[in-house]
Amino acid sequence: MAQFQQTVNMQTLQAAAGRNSLVNDLASRRVYDNAVEELNARSRRPKVHFSKSVSTEQTLLASNAYPEFEISFTHTQQAVHSLAGGLRTLELEYLMMQVPFGSLTYDIGGNFAAHLFKGRDYVHCCMPNLDVRDIARHEGHKEAIFSYLSRLDRQRRPVPEYQRAAFHNYAENPHFVHCDRPFQQCELSTVNRWDTYAIALHSIYDIPADEFGAALLRKNVKICYAAFHFHENMLLDCDSVTLEDIGATFQRAGDKLNFFFHNESTLNYTHSFSNIIKYVCKTFFPASQRYVYHKEFLVTRVNTWYCKFTRVDTFTLFRGVYKTSVDSEEFYKAMDDAWEYKKTLAMLNSERTIFKDSAAINFWFPKVRDMVIIPLFDASITTGRMSRREVLVNKDFVYTVLNHIKTYQAKALTYANVLSFVESIRSRVIINGVTARSEWDTDKAILGPLAMTFFLVTKLSHVQDEIVLKKFQKFDATAKELIWSSLCDALKGVIPSVKETLARGGFVKLAEESLEIKIPELYCTFTDRLVLEYKRTEEFQSCDLSKPLEESEKYYNALSELSVLENLGSFDLDAFKELCQKKNVDPDVAAKVVVAIMNSELTLPFKKPTEEEVAEALSGEVVQDEGLRLSNKAPFPCVSNLKEGLVPACGLCPNGANFDRVDMDISEFHLKSVDAVKKGAMMSAVYTGKIKVQQMKNYVDYLSASLSATVSNLCKVLRDVHGVDPESQEKSGVWDVRRGRWLLKPNAKCHAWGVAEDANHKLVIVLLNWDEGKPVCDETWFRLAVSSDSLVYSDMGKLKTLTSCCRDGEPPEPTAKLVLVDGVPGCGKTKEILEKVNFSEDLVLVPGKEASKMIIRRANQAGITRADKDNVRTVDSFLMHPPKRVFKRLFIDEGLMLHTGCVNFLMLLSHCDVAYVYVDTQQIPFICRVANFPYPAHFAKLVVDEKEDRRVTLRCPADVTYFLNQKYDGSVLCTSSVERSVSAEVVRGKGALNPITLPLEGKILTFTQADKFELLDKGYKDVNTVHEVQGETYEKTAIVRLTATPLEIISRASPHVLVALTRHTTRCKYYTVVLDPMVNVISELGKLSNFLLEMYKVESGTQXQLQIDTVFKGTNLFVPTPKSGDWRDMQFYYDTLLPGNSTILNEFDAVTMNLRDISLNVKDCRIDFSKSVQVPKERPVFMKPKLRTAAEMPRTAGLLENLVAMIKRNMNAPDLTGTIDIEDTASLVVEKFWDAYVVKEFSGTDGMAMTRESFSRWLSKQESSTVGQLADFNFVDLPAVDEYKHMIKSQPKQKLDLSIQDEYPALQTIVYHSKKINAIFGPMFSELTRMLLETIDTSKFLFYTRKTPTQIEEFFSDLDSSQAMEILELDISKYDKSQNEFHCAVEYKIWEKLGIDDWLAEVWRQGHRKTTLKDYTAGIKTCLWYQRKSGDVTTFIGNTIIIAACLSSMIPMDKVIKAAFCGDDSLIYIPKGLDLPDIQAGANLTWNFEAKLFRKKYGYFCGRYVIHHDRGAIVYYDPLKLISKLGCKHIRDEVHLEELRRSLCDVTSNLNNCAYFSQLDEAVAEVHKTAVGGAFVYCSIIKYLSDKRLFKDLFFV
């Protein structure tokens, strides 16, 4: 082939050289055709427009550097660093040429405008604002786009076709086009985990090299192409390196590397030198345990280096690759370091392989070929100091000079001669009149210092040779003097102070009696320097083991101290060590404290023994509290002036104040400062002494905390109330003393005490008397606050009594013998007390007044008065007014309902010899009603001397006795002749309960206060909760449950169920609206045989059932869902899960409600009945669905509809809260919230910055009608912030239960501000929300706001199904209207931590305290206190914050695996077996929530099932909810129908994967007990949603 081509060429040349014109023409034609083909090929190159004005040389430089492009130079724009700026375009296009067209590409730090102009709709730019210059650059990009679009608009031209997709993305989905986060934190997700690509144009400088690989892998980047500026001289000890081609300079100062352009006033760029060196020197960038990114250099063009990073799967490496051989030469070199560092460092240094190939170095660094690094020395005559620097010099030049001057004689070897020779071989020479250029192009500026280096090296080499020759000669002078003499003679006149100069330069080393001459290394190659530079950045630091050994010794001694514990194997030693290290606590002291705590010799007041609680108690010393001396000199008409005396300032502490044992009066609290009461509450103390004494101290602190919380709330009421509201009926009240009227009217009168504000605005506690319903006040008082908690002196009196019997803050330990009588319900505990008690010398104490009256009545029923108010008393009365007598025996009924410290005080104050405490260990125990007060578990156990059991019930029938045997140890017997007494009835909704149609027989009991109040509103009488009637007996009882959602207190293990089933003697019937565990219990009791019931009159053992749990193991597969089935499959599935719902004929329910008489329980409101008659309107025609569901027709707003909705959503709010200190408790909750969810690095905030951009962002999301409402708003003054508008939604919300069969569902309401208010506070809270979401630890917690549904699946995708875990769902009914003053306080404190403006925050707070609702459509006006407004700007994020704060206050969030929150929905994954508090009680008493806690196998969040499996999780939309939507009755036309289909397709995309349908069936079965396997239904759903025609068949006109 080669011979043939050569022949053709020769023939062509011969033809061209001949005279034949035809042949010549053919040759010319051939040359012309070749030129045309070449030019056509060049014209097909990508075209790049180079508008910068550059010189001719720079034009040629750019054209030669990038032959892949056809560059057109127009020279129409003058700019700074024109060449570098123009090359950026070429560099970007060159990088994009490497990426496959259409593949998703991340442009790290890129220019999104350039991609839009090119029509690239597949590029996402990560543009973080790392400094102000970045912000300005990004604004310039936006301005360029705006100018381009404006020009098209002026010319009335559309956007070109190739740009439309990109500009459409920019307009509709700007987050896909660009984001303001660093690449490592970019939130853009890829579809189906396809491979992506990335480019980095001059942006990897600011990405840490150690994070680069992991960041690429997170985005599933296959190849990343990068370009950056670099120069070989940067690896030398050079302070400055110039990039001549682009006119820029690198300047190095330590690790700081500055980059700037010459002769320009532009900002400098600063980078990390060590980080850039890693990118240059490292080859592998680890991304995970499996993947690494391998770096390869591509090409170098105009001072820009190109490289690519390729993802490599190390699992595919041949196993022989992993053998690591040791370089013996490098190992011996590293042995010197092994003496200073660890031996492993020597092994690491010996195994380094990077850049060992010099050919590769020379290829990629061509300028360093045959170059060596020479040190240069500069000396100062004035200071005597010497500096050192390095340069690259040709290797041949160095040896030529050294070999020549080595031949000089000693006299001829001078610096001048060496410099002369160096200059001569560097300069031009003239040979025969012709100038010849020197062979070596060495910089003339360094010839002088370079000659000095050659001179010094040669001189020292001669001196070394002389010493070797004279080594065995004898001289009078010492060797040291001889050497110094030789050195001084050799260098005389060259450098002053030769000795100091040589020593400073490292040429000689001095010792006291020795001298060492060391010739420095003449040079090192660039390869060696590159390896050294890389090693320098990777060397390990030394480690001092002395301190760790000392700490280990301390921990060993501490472990010896802990060895006395019984369960040492379960003791967490790692947590103990972390505690001591984090809190700087001595391990030995901490071990002794732990042993004392475990042995109950010492108690710390915490709920959980966390390291923070233990460290807080160990670090600080308890300060002795001083007594508060009172002197009342102010006139007081009803309470006599007080004498001076001492009263306690707070609860007990180990070193408390001294109190004399005197009979103090409660009036000593009069005019006591509120600060004296508040300062001692919730203090951190260490309880010491015996366990009884510790319990007594805890009880006194409990009373102090309760009093402090009440006083604090009264102070808050005084601060908050400003205007007059005489119509309100609240728990708290404020009396204006000077005007003689209520500013805030309480719902009760005749309070015992309150908090008054005097003329000096000082707050004091005052005791009250009343005159005709008005408090008698001092003339110096300004205002007075009272509340329902200040109706009696209970806490004051008890606190006074208990502190009076203490000496030096230590209560005496009671010496009485304590006998615990544990009896089953109905065992005759009260009867036994009456039989054993001697009323002349014994004392009987009971918890309540009713029980006291009952015992007195039964004791005196024979006609002889034995019991009276002196020997049968309530516990509170006894503690407030202890008698001055001694009792022989003490009988306490229902003792477990009391604080254990209270029981000990009762024994102490009664001076009894024996105390009988009658309890039921399985019934409701003492509930701590002060939020966040520490009541450790071991304090809840009474210290008893004897225990007696009563296992024969005189009250309970035989079937209930069977249930009791499952609860108590031992056999429970009964004496009742009644065998069957319990029954249950499931009613069709709460509306079926009515005193007329369904009268209830016997005593009516409920589980919740809400159900109790609702029954009272319906007209039922004599209704109490189960907790209120504990200890009572009734012949017949009726237990009612109106709450349809599950309640945690209704379970087999709940003491509430036990109490409820054991109050009757003959009959008990349970009415419920839903199947629950209590129905199952009653059903089981009804199935018992008569023979089995008779057995409980004799001893019988308890049988247990062996259960086997199933374990599911799945695989992460994608199996397409087959499109099969019929719409009747969906109908069958709906009817199976919700039987009866499809048969409801509710089309005319709204008409029936408007026509028939109706009775509504309405709170105070104003109604305009002129709005009751609706204006006739033409009713629209809607399409009818084939699927029959419980969906209703759209309703029309009117008086009745709106009023019913308002009653349901806003009135009759629950009131379950116990006694809490709102301010202190809110602060504690917020601190827990912050510690639980906020990343520690972002826990500090710089304050909120309201800018024009934040308002513009809010305004851009508003509709045009909203903007029009702001046209006449001047923003000078605020409208009324406490006024809201009220409206309803036309479509009722479908419930996935059976309530629709008996109830008329109320519509959802929207309570909203005017747009003018939203324009002020909307941007502010939007910015605060953004700040909060940025600080949340998103690896563990999901706040589902400002996110897409697919991000739910991404969040749960890293769940480990092999880990044993529990799934908790907290469902709260009446969530919005249950939120009261405490919830607002928590939310405001969170906004304060984020930096909200104080003035606006106060305006917002006052606007949400007491609010007015106006419904102009229905003519309704009412007033609400607090509550969550459904249309407020903070509704969604506020609800999300509250549910998250509620859970963080009760659940240890540091142990949580995953948690998600959205409005009132929550989903928490916790390790299995985690010890949790009573969430039901906490939610009721502290948060006023009717909470239901679900424990499930699969999670349910925002209408979606979260199915976790062995490789992650998949989220399925609730199929039953989807079918319910397919039966909707508000579709207007086919366009509306198509919109519905598309929206359903979006939310149900995961149903196309049928790999996990079996787990989905299990999840559905957890919620709906009648569920069947639904795979056939899911296939049918996909079939109809994916086909427009089939979907239209589901509806007809």
From Swiss-Prot:
This is Replicase large subunit. Belongs to the tobamovirus RNA-directed RNA polymerase family. GO terms for biological process: DNA-templated transcription; mRNA modification; RNA processing; symbiont-mediated suppression of host innate immune response; viral RNA genome replication. It catalyses: RNA(n) + a ribonucleoside 5'-triphosphate = RNA(n+1) + diphosphate; ATP + H2O = ADP + phosphate + H(+). The keyword Nucleotide-binding applies. Residues 951-1103 form the (+)RNA virus helicase C-terminal domain. Residues 1365-1478 form the RdRp catalytic domain. It comes from the Viruses.
